[in-house]
């Protein structure tokens, strides 16, 4: 009976029918803590604290509790996490490199490890003896990642800032005392240039062991093995995760290497960002890629789809030093963060709030989950410490002594609905708070330098100062009829050109008293039966935009008849026009300086002699008035008004002037001709005379406007 009862009793962790019973392990995540004995300071060569960059638990069965830590000065230390004696806690310490060690990897099943350093080399070490086995040379920049295959102990891969991925085999003989790469992928994460595609040309044979190119802008940040013949890599700027087949030769042709599969950047950022860490779950199916856009993407490494299966949010990733790790059973994901904490997500529920390991005072960079013990986690931080987190053994509440010894604790992060929505959409503009009476000036960003120099200090400005003063605003117009409604604006199609010129911002469209305009208004003049107002464009006149402001030189020129004529706005040397006021002055020899077009219709045909004050204008218009009767002048004015001038108009004018009988009868034609030649531009071409267009075929300018309705 006793034997049967023992056999029928369910085993620990199994149900009644022998099926494994799954415990809710996520409830245990909040029980992680770190005490002072598990906090280790990373010291440099001179005894000063330096930040640790990499940590990894051993893969040897009898040494799975040994933690290897590499720091910024190239020192590697081995800690026994099971030992409670502080004197025996540090197992081994040696100077691996003279530069920073960025990554570290254990040889599967052996007491050896490989370090990747900023001195452009990777070294193989015997950790028990502390001796150097071999040195790998071939990279031309810092090495950022090193990884071993689970199926091969002698083969490992490295990735560097030179953009190259190199394969190493420690079974090969050393040349010159160093290991050389057996295979390499040059420019693994170079940006694709669509305008200048690479040409298919054979590579020239190069010296074995030297990388053919250096491109620090296309750095390879992480390389891991998927299986014996496949590696996965990620870069710093291209935002693509690539899978490579090592059985293919990528250096035979001068072209960018093509991976067998790639995962494009799945985020919403306009600029493709890079990845700082890649990690596979124990089955090798799920690939976790930690991106610098504060997301961890989970891809199906064995499937055909390239879209992420899940996205883990909540942490911050602002550097390429932040790494990730997976629990031994593959149920949880661990990652460092820039907000001084480590995060743990449940893989099966990515939308659930993560558990944070708090206590560090700087960025948490490298993390490691012990593959032989679920209850043990290691974290490295920029606060120059390495911490080992363990599950609390007791189920009772912590005593006062335990709280004093605790330097790290775990808690569940609370997600706010606004923060979750902000991760899924583009942030909008902040709304203005109506309750606040002050508007603060912008504060410096968190990444701004401390030495601000002469920059102004943040201040608060009353909102009332930003509001417009009602005294400075235009008051509402009140109708004369007594109604408090402003008159209806006239449509632009029914308004004449006079309304556009004389209206001011404070005047209405129609009023009983005309509001004087600050600009000179156009005065209506009598028009010819078939000719509108005309203007002659002189030979040396330059085309420019019409301005209604008065120039400083002609500010004193006032028309005696108050005709409101439009005067010249620029000096005569720049813009000389046919000013009717100057012509009228020479005709009457009086103070009346205004000439209206109605006088021209009466047959005004006299020759004007220029006065000293108007010599500049009269020299330009003298030859034009000598053309003959008024009908010829009308024809010229009409052509200049209603048609654009031809390129040979200057030569045609001179030819017509020479052939005029009145000009032949004049006493001194040579002086006038010389004056005209001085006014002509040098580059005027000589071409035949153009025939003017008959005025009958032209449309009157007055037909383009509507009469103002009264």
Curated annotation (Swiss-Prot):
Chain segments carrying region Disordered: 428-534, 652-698
Record motif DDB1-binding motif, residues: 168-171, 244-247
GO BP: any one term: response to UV
Pathway: Protein modification; protein ubiquitination
Cited Pfam families: WD40 (PF00400)
Molecular-function GO terms, alphabetical: protein-macromolecule adaptor activity
Matches recorded under PROSITE patterns: WD_REPEATS_1, WD_REPEATS_2, WD_REPEATS_REGION
Swiss-Prot/TrEMBL WD repeat ranges: 47-89, 96-135, 138-178, 215-254, 270-309, 314-355, 359-398
Biased composition (Polar residues): 504-516, 659-690
Chief site of localization: nucleus
InterPro entries, A to Z: G-protein_beta_WD-40_rep, WD-repeat_CDT2_adapter, WD40/YVTN_repeat-like_dom_sf, WD40_repeat_CS, WD40_repeat_dom_sf, WD40_rpt
Swiss-Prot/TrEMBL keywords: Biological rhythms, Chromosome, Cytoplasm, Cytoskeleton, DNA damage, DNA replication, Nucleus, Repeat, Ubl conjugation pathway, WD repeat
UniProt keyword annotation of Repeat present: yes
Amino acid composition bias (Low complexity), ranges on this chain: 430-450
Domain of life: Eukaryota
GO cellular component: centrosome; chromosome; Cul4A-RING E3 ubiquitin ligase complex; Cul4B-RING E3 ubiquitin ligase complex; cytoplasm; nucleus
Family: Belongs to the WD repeat cdt2 family.
Role summary: Substrate-specific adapter of a DCX (DDB1-CUL4-X-box) E3 ubiquitin-protein ligase complex required for cell cycle control, DNA damage response and translesion DNA synthesis. The DCX(DTL) complex, also named CRL4(CDT2) complex, mediates the polyubiquitination and subsequent degradation of CDT1, CDKN1A/p21(CIP1), KMT5A and SDE2. CDT1 degradation in response to DNA damage is necessary to ensure proper cell cycle regulation of DNA replication. CDKN1A/p21(CIP1) degradation during S phase or following UV irradiation is essential to control replication licensing.
Protein name per UniProt: Denticleless protein homolog A
Biological source species: Xenopus laevis
């Amino acid at each position: 009976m006793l034997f049967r009862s023992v056999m029928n009793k369910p085993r620990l962790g199994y149900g009644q029918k022998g099926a494994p019973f799954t415990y809710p392990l996520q409830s245990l995540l909040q029980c992680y803590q770190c005490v002072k004995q598990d906090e280790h300071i990373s010291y440099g060569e001179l005894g000063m604290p330096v930040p640790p960059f990499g940590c990894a638990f051993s893969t040897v069965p009898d040494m799975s509790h040994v933690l290897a830590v590499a720091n910024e000065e190239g020192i590697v230390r081995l800690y026994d996490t099971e030992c409670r004696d502080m004197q025996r806690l540090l197992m081994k310490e040696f100077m691996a490199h003279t530069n920073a060690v960025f990554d570290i990897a254990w040889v599967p099943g052996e007491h050896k490890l490989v370090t990747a350093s900023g001195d452009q080399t990777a070294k193989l070490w015997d950790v028990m003896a502390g001796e150097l086995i071999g040195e790998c040379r071939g990279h031309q920049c810092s090495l950022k990642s090193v990884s071993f295959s689970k199926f091969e102990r002698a083969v490992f891969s490295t990735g560097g800032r030179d953009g190259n991925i190199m394969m190493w085999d420690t079974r090969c003989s050393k040349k010159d005392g160093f290991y050389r790469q057996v295979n390499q992928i040059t420019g693994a994460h170079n940006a694709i240039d669509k305008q200048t595609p690479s040409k298919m040309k054979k590579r020239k044979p190069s010296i074995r062991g030297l990388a053919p190119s250096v491109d620090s802008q296309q750095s390879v940040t992480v390389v891991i093995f998927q299986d014996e013949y496949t590696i996965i890599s990620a870069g710093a700027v291209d935002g693509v995760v690539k899978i490579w087949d090592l059985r293919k030769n990528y250096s035979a042709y001068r072209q960018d290497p093509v991976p067998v599969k790639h995962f494009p950047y799945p985020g919403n950022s306009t600029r493709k960002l890079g990845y700082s860490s890649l990690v596979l779950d124990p089955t090798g199916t799920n690939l976790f890629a930690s991106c610098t856009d504060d997301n961890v993407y989970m891809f199906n490494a064995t499937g055909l789809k390239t879209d992420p299966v899940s996205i883990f949010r909540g942490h911050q990733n602002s550097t390429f030093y932040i790494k990730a790790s997976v629990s031994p059973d593959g149920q949880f994901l661990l990652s460092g963060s820039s907000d001084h904490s480590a995060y743990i997500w449940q893989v099966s529920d990515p939308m659930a709030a993560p558990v944070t390991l708090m206590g560090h005072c700087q960025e948490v960079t490298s993390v490691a989950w012990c593959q032989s013990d679920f209850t043990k986690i290691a974290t490295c931080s920029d606060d120059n410490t390495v911490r080992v987190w363990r599950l609390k053994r007791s189920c009772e509440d912590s005593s006062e002594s335990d709280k004093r010894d605790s330097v790290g604790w775990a808690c569940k992060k609370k997600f706010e609905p606004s923060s979750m929505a902000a991760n899924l959409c583009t942030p909008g503009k902040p709304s203005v708070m109506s309750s606040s009476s002050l508007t603060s000036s912008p504060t410096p960003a968190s990444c701004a330098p401390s030495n601000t120099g002469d920059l102004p200090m943040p201040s608060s400005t009353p909102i009332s100062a930003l509001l417009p003063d009602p005294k400075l605003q235009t008051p509402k117009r009140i109708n004369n009829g007594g109604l408090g409604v402003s008159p209806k604006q006239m449509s632009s199609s029914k308004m004449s050109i006079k309304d556009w010129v004389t209206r001011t911002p404070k005047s209405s469209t129609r009023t009983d008293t005309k509001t004087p305009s600050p600009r000179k208004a156009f005065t209506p003049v009598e028009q010819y039966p078939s000719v509108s107002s005309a203007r002659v464009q002189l030979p040396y006149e330059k085309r420019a935009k019409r301005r209604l402001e008065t120039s400083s030189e002609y500010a004193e020129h006032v028309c005696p008849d108050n005709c409101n004529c439009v005067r010249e706005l620029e000096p005569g040397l720049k813009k000389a026009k046919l000013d009717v006021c100057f012509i009228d002055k020479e005709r009457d020899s009086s103070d009346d300086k205004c000439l209206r077009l109605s006088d021209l219709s009466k047959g005004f045909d006299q020759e004007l002699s220029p006065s000293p004050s108007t010599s500049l204008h009269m020299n330009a218009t003298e030859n034009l008035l000598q053309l003959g009767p008024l009908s010829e002048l009308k024809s010229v004015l009409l052509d200049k008004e209603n048609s654009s001038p031809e390129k040979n108009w200057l030569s045609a004018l001179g030819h017509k002037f020479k052939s005029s009988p009145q000009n032949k009868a004049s006493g001194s034609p040579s002086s006038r001709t010389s004056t005209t030649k001085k006014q002509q531009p040098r580059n005027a071409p000589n071409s035949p005379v153009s025939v003017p267009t008959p005025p009958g075929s032209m449309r009157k300018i007055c037909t383009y406007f509507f009469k103002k309705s009264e």
